[in-house]
């Protein structure tokens, strides 16, 4: 199964971009959850505006769907500047990055998603740009080639990544602010679902908002996606009114269980229990057993399962916890 095809995938889908922009908070005052990040960014932004400086370069990391792009746009809005958006895989040539940098206005935000996927050549261009607001460009080729320096306006680079550990030390060290986004509480997600319902003019009961939230794996993007699918169900089956029973029926139809697990989650946990006697099992063996890439397990499936206490990562491999056995109605054998 392709990760992006899952209803509970934290990754963005192409057709969601327009709707997501419509319901995305624009300012910190509307930003729900991540209280420590919100408080710190409020201070940093106000201080930069008081000094009339560009905000320090900002690195945002965490699992997919937690609002890294949203936070980058909020930073630009709060600073009252423009934001230019790109991603690591798109920046193939130094000239691509140079063109973006030279078109920035003072204090503008350059947002690079998936920044861990930048090539070494692009990183070399970024170092002086981030540190000294200078751009080194090579003119000509061969023996006649020469380097010229261009001054850049003070700007803020906002980098987003799901794999902070994959960043090179020289690049990571150039970020003055580093923020980690955590999975959201059910209470915060309930508020997000209710806010999104208001933006979409939906008739949503509070209990239904909670039901969607608790199955959303701590991830706003998943919560909003499930809300839209529940809306479809309600439009067809209940005159557009999203009650608690309608929400439960719709989510059951979507094969999202009470813990927010889908078939792939249950397949992974079942494999650990049934094929490997609860573990420990190595990542490569587990990937082979369920027919998925090890990166998919490590970056997409595991974070939520570990955070929720269903899977334990040890030096010897992955282990199913007692909570996993209870979820499947099984009794864990004593060692």
UniProtKB/Swiss-Prot annotation:
Record keyword Cell inner membrane present: no
Q: What residues does ATP bind to? A: 23-24, 65, 68-70, 131-133, 174, 184, 221
InterPro entries the UniProt entry points to = AAA+_ATPase, AAA_lid_4, DNA_helicase_Holl-junc_RuvB, P-loop_NTPase, RuvB-like_N, RuvB_C, WH-like_DNA-bd_sf, WH_DNA-bd_sf
Gene Ontology cellular-component annotations: cytoplasm; Holliday junction resolvase complex
**Keyword field:** ATP-binding, Cytoplasm, DNA damage, DNA recombination, DNA repair, DNA-binding, Hydrolase, Nucleotide-binding
Question: Does Hydrolase appear among the keywords?
Answer: yes
Q: What is its main location?
A: cytoplasm
- Region Large ATPase domain (RuvB-L), annotated ranges: 4-184
Where it sits in the cell: the answer is:
Cytoplasm
Q: Which residues are noted in the entry as DNA-binding? A: 294, 313, 318
What residue spans carry the region label Head domain (RuvB-H)?
258-335
Q: Which reaction does it catalyse?
A: ATP + H2O = ADP + phosphate + H(+)
The family database entries (Pfam families) matched by this protein are listed as:
AAA_lid_4, RuvB_C, RuvB_N
The top EC class, named as a word, is hydrolase
Alphabetized SUPFAM superfamilies for the sequence: P-loop containing nucleoside triphosphate hydrolases, Winged helix' DNA-binding domain
Q: What Gene Ontology molecular function terms does this protein carry?
A: ATP binding; ATP hydrolysis activity; four-way junction DNA binding; four-way junction helicase activity
- Any one biological process term the GO annotation gives: DNA repair
User: Which of this chain's residues are annotated to bind Mg(2+)?
Assistant: 69
**EC number(s) of the enzyme?**
3.6.4.-
Similarity field: Belongs to the RuvB family.
NCBIfam families xref list: PRK00080.1, ruvB
Task: Outline what the protein does.
Answer: The RuvA-RuvB-RuvC complex processes Holliday junction (HJ) DNA during genetic recombination and DNA repair, while the RuvA-RuvB complex plays an important role in the rescue of blocked DNA replication forks via replication fork reversal (RFR). RuvA specifically binds to HJ cruciform DNA, conferring on it an open structure. The RuvB hexamer acts as an ATP-dependent pump, pulling dsDNA into and through the RuvAB complex. RuvB forms 2 homohexamers on either side of HJ DNA bound by 1 or 2 RuvA tetramers; 4 subunits per hexamer contact DNA at a time.
For domains, the record's comment is: Has 3 domains, the large (RuvB-L) and small ATPase (RuvB-S) domains and the C-terminal head (RuvB-H) domain. The head domain binds DNA, while the ATPase domains jointly bind ATP, ADP or are empty depending on the state of the subunit in the translocation cycle. During a single DNA translocation step the structure of each domain remains the same, but their relative positions change.
Q: What is this protein called in UniProt?
A: Holliday junction branch migration complex subunit RuvB
Species name for this entry? Haemophilus influenzae (strain 86-028NP)
Name of encoding gene: ruvB
């Amino acid at each position: 199964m392709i990760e992006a095809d899952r209803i509970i995938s934290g990754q963005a889908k192409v057709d969601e971009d327009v709707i997501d922009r419509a319901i995305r908070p624009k300012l910190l005052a509307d930003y729900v959850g991540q209280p420590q990040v919100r408080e710190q960014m409020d201070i940093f932004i106000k201080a930069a505006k008081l000094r009339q400086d560009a905000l320090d370069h900002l690195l945002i990391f965490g699992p997919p769907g937690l609002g890294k792009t949203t936070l980058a746009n909020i930073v630009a809005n709060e600073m009252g500047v423009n934001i230019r958006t790109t991603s690591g895989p798109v920046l193939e040539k130094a000239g691509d990055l140079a063109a973006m940098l030279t078109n920035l206005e003072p204090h503008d935000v350059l947002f690079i998603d998936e920044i861990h996927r930048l090539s070494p050549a692009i990183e070399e261009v970024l170092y002086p740009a981030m540190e000294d607001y200078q751009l080194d460009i090579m003119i000509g080729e061969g023996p006649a080639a020469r380097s010229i320096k261009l001054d850049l306006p003070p700007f803020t680079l906002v980098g987003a990544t799901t794999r902070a550990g994959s960043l090179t030390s020289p690049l990571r060290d150039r970020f003055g602010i580093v923020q980690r986004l955590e999975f959201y509480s059910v209470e915060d997600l309930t508020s997000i679902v209710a806010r999104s319902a208001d933006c979409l003019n939906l008739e949503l009961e509070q209990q239904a908002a909670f039901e969607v939230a608790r199955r959303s794996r701590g991830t706003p993007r998943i919560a909003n996606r499930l809300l839209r699918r529940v809306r479809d169900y309600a439009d067809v089956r209940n005159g557009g009114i999203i009650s608690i029973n309608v929400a439960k029926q719709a989510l059951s139809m979507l094969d999202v269980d009470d813990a927010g697990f889908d078939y792939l989650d249950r397949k992974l946990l079942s494999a650990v229990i049934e094929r490997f006697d609860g573990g420990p099992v190595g990542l490569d063996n587990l990937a082979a057993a369920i027919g998925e890439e090890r990166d998919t397990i490590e970056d997409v499936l595991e974070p939520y399962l570990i955070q929720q206490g269903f899977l334990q990562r040890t030096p010897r491999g992955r282990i199913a916890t007692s909570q996993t056995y209870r979820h499947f109605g099984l009794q864990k054998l004593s060692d």
